[in-house]
Amino acid sequence: MIDQSKLIERWKTTFETAQNPTELLAFKNSFRNADLKPLLSQIKETTDIETKRHLGQLYKQLESTLQTLHDTQLQVFTQAQSSSVLTHGDVMLLATSFAPGSSNIIYQVIDELVNYFKKFLFTVNYDSELTTIADCFDLLNIPKDHPSRNLTDTFYLDKNRLLRTHCTAATLRAVKETKKSNNPDIRIASFGAVFRKDDDDATHSHQFNQLDFMWIKKDFSLTNLKWFMQNMINHIFGENTSARFRLSHFPFTEPSFEIDIRCWLCQNGCGVCKKTRWIEVLGAGILHPQVMANMGFSDTDNIRGIAAGIGIERLVMLKHGISDIRDLYDNNFKFLAQFTD
């Protein structure tokens, strides 16, 4: 059992020994890893509802206290620095030191995904954000009356070119190019920015990041898809993460699935999972025969493809408990400093 008062006193005493803001931030990150992460793991593993609720409240209290202690001591440094500059300093002098940088949490998750796909010998593809109607819609079996083709949903440059609405367009081009070498086992993953005419709010953005993959091989089946996706979910969210596959519909896969993970904050439903006990993560499926034919594969060869599209920001928000997607883009250093790698 955590002795809350002793833990907070240890944090406070240690923060007061910091010599500068960089060391102060290092202390805070150390405390998060050593004291709070084990508690979060305990919450995920606990099955008793009351225990989970109690530990969740304790985690929120400790996290808030840690941030408050850090901010209080940081204010001491800020005031001392301002006083020193105003009294003695030459404000025109160049800075003698800079705070160390760190990769953004979006790219931390992209790196995790890229490392996962590289373990399975995928070619990782980063292509142009500009694409054609054929690659973005026609060759992916998206009908001409589909809402995503509308001018109100997509950024068109002219009658044939547009900003891609998904990374599948890049993956499709790479697969067609790779097929020219008669490779019997094609593994392509693409990532990058995609664009949609959405109004920016807590869960939507007109520009966000996506990772898409296709793995095409003889005799592939749903078993291969479920095995591969479950392993990827475990890689991102931790071993033994429960996942379920719900039948859905996408024009480019048949059958199609929405993949959900078990909500780690509750047992009987909460605000995060909208009382369903499950949280939607991504879409996947077996590539539609028409899409396979459009890429030059013959149905008689019994070649099948598995595919999925993954919203990076959604994974980041789920992984770190972030409720507003705009927080990822606002360049709030205080917010971003919590997730230094």
From Swiss-Prot:
Q: Which residues bind Mg(2+)?
A: E254
**Main location class:** cytoplasm
Q: EC top class, in one word?
A: ligase
Reaction catalysed by this chain?
A: tRNA(Phe) + L-phenylalanine + ATP = L-phenylalanyl-tRNA(Phe) + AMP + diphosphate + H(+)
Cofactor: binding details: Binds 2 magnesium ions per tetramer.
UniProt keywords, alphabetically: Aminoacyl-tRNA synthetase, ATP-binding, Cytoplasm, Ligase, Magnesium, Metal-binding, Nucleotide-binding, Protein biosynthesis
Cofactor(s) required for function per UniProt: Mg(2+)
Supply the SUPFAM superfamilies for this chain.
Answer: Class II aaRS and biotin synthetases
Biological process terms from the Gene Ontology for this record are: phenylalanyl-tRNA aminoacylation
Q: Which GO terms describe its molecular function?
A: ATP binding; magnesium ion binding; phenylalanine-tRNA ligase activity; tRNA binding
**Gene3D superfamilies in alphabetical order:** Bira Bifunctional Protein, Domain 2 (3.30.930.10)
Out of the domains of life, which is the source? Answer: Bacteria
* Localization per record: Cytoplasm
EC number(s) per entry: 6.1.1.20
Give a Gene Ontology cellular component term annotated to this protein: cytoplasm
Q: Which InterPro entries match?
A: aa-tRNA-synth_II, aa-tRNA-synth_II/BPL/LPL, Phe-tRNA-synth_IIc_asu, Phe_tRNA_ligase_alpha1_bac, Phenylalanyl-tRNA_Synthase
Task: Describe the family membership recorded for this protein in Swiss-Prot or TrEMBL.
Answer: Belongs to the class-II aminoacyl-tRNA synthetase family. Phe-tRNA synthetase alpha subunit type 1 subfamily.
- Description of how the protein assembles with itself and partners: Tetramer of two alpha and two beta subunits.
Q: Which protein are we looking at?
A: Phenylalanine--tRNA ligase alpha subunit
The upper taxonomy is: Bacteria, Bacillati, Mycoplasmatota, Mycoplasmoidales, Mycoplasmoidaceae
